[in-house]
């Protein structure tokens, strides 16, 4: 069984461990989430809970949305996400999920949308090496070989210039350094994907070392 919560990335800071070690942490604000729906193997083919995060104005929600959240006796939500393989029996529709479901020392997987970088070349986008910049070379930052003559086409998957960033990224096995229940904050060791104020999903690690 896994557990999870939705939150917003606030930024990064540093905290000191008891042994004096300086730990870089990402601060995530996870105000109480509301369980909007429970999905079970019998009705949906899999187990999951649907969480709603951050209220939005009533007039921004259509009729189906309003009816959906009314079953949980809550306001329409800006973000709705599913947590797969959650403890369906231990939660009820309308119940709040808070940061205290996690504890310091646990490992989690954090999912977010990476920062958009716009249209970038093969060097920045794929880490390709550039060519010589002088001595008569005319190959500097180009993508390189497009393949042999015979196929008369460029193979799918060729690493070329294009839009970079804005992808869903999951970083696994990050350690929770501190849980601030009063301020609804999670301090997670290291960096997590996304810009400041972006939505992140924090779930129990699926590959945690036992």
Swiss-Prot record:
List the coiled-coil residues.
Answer: none
Quote the cellular component terms of the Gene Ontology held in the record: cytosolic large ribosomal subunit
Q: Which family does it belong to?
A: Belongs to the universal ribosomal protein uL3 family.
Q: Which GO terms describe its biological process?
A: translation
Its biological purpose is as follows: One of the primary rRNA binding proteins, it binds directly near the 3'-end of the 23S rRNA, where it nucleates assembly of the 50S subunit.
What are the record keywords, sorted? Ribonucleoprotein, Ribosomal protein, RNA-binding, rRNA-binding
On subunit structure and binding partners, the annotation says: Part of the 50S ribosomal subunit. Forms a cluster with proteins L14 and L19.
Region of interest: Disordered: 119-151
Q: Which domain of life is it from?
A: Bacteria
Keyword RNA-binding belongs to the record? yes
Q: Which GO terms describe its molecular function?
A: rRNA binding; structural constituent of ribosome
User: What's the name of the protein?
Assistant: Large ribosomal subunit protein uL3
HAMAP family membership = Ribosomal_uL3_B
């Amino acid at each position: 069984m896994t557990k999870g919560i939705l939150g917003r990335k606030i930024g990064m800071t540093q905290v000191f461990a008891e042994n004096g070690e300086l730990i870089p942490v990402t601060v995530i604000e996870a105000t109480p989430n509301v369980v909007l729906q429970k999905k079970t193997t019998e009705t949906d083919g899999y187990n999951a809970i649907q969480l709603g995060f951050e209220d939005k104005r009533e007039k921004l929600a259509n009729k189906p949305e309003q009816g959906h959240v009314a079953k949980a006796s809550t306001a329409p939500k800006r973000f709705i996400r599913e947590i797969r393989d959650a403890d369906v029996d231990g939660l009820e529709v309308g119940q709040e999920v808070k940061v205290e479901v996690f504890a310091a020392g646990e490992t989690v997987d954090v999912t977010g949308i990476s920062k958009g970088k716009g249209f970038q070349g093969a060097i920045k986008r794929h880490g390709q090496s550039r060519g010589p910049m002088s001595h008569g070379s005319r190959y500097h930052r180009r993508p390189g070989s497009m393949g042999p003559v015979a196929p008369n086409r460029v193979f799918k998957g060729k690493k070329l210039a294009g839009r970079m960033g804005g992808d869903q990224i999951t970083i696994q096995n990050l350690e929770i350094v501190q849980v601030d229940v009063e301020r609804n904050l999670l301090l997670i060791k290291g960096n997590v994907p996304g810009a400041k104020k972006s939505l992140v999903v924090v779930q129990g690690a699926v590959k945690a070392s036992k």
